[in-house]
């Protein structure tokens, strides 16, 4: 009986720590090796106030990255002298000039060229040999007025050409006598019925014959149309000389730009 109790006591005695086999994790590796690879720091509980040390290799790599990031910024940074050179100012001036030219769209040039083929307008231009009512600047103002009125190009008809030409003469010419002839060409009168002096026109109206009454009513209607056309341009009838030259520069070889009073001898 004593021997049996002695064996039982020997089986329950703890074995030395060196002989105990280390516990293994579910993956089959020792638990101590896994903890040493993943956890760093003291085994005692608590938080270490000192930050973890970074290796010199990481610091050197971070410095190289910072230097590589700074290099494109240095290359892309413009020099301050290139911003304030005179060429930049000239470029801005040319850009503003192109913007002013774009106000007159090509469709208004096409409408102007289409109306030049009108037989009544052809007769007016052929009659005005002295260029008193249709020189190149007055005709360029017609294109400017078409642009300012803002109608679609296909809507411009013969009446609009005469309205614009008459309004251009109102703005630029002081002599009223030649301007009155525009009425007669508009209403397709013959050359023999066109008075050359303004006094002859008032003399016709004074007698108040049926033909004179008809002419007076047509002139009154024309002036009414002229007022509406002037309002459609927002009362902007003045055109600068620079804008007129830019309109002519769109097609400098056009035959109407040869109608220059300076070339008359």
Swiss-Prot record:
InterPro entries: Speedy (IPR020984)
Start-end of Acidic residues biased regions: 66-80
Pfam families: Spy1 (PF11357)
Bias (Low complexity) ranges: 13-23
Superkingdom: Eukaryota
Gene Ontology molecular-function annotations: protein kinase binding
Region (Disordered): 1-80
Family that this chain belongs to: Belongs to the Speedy/Ringo family.
Protein name per the record: Speedy protein E12
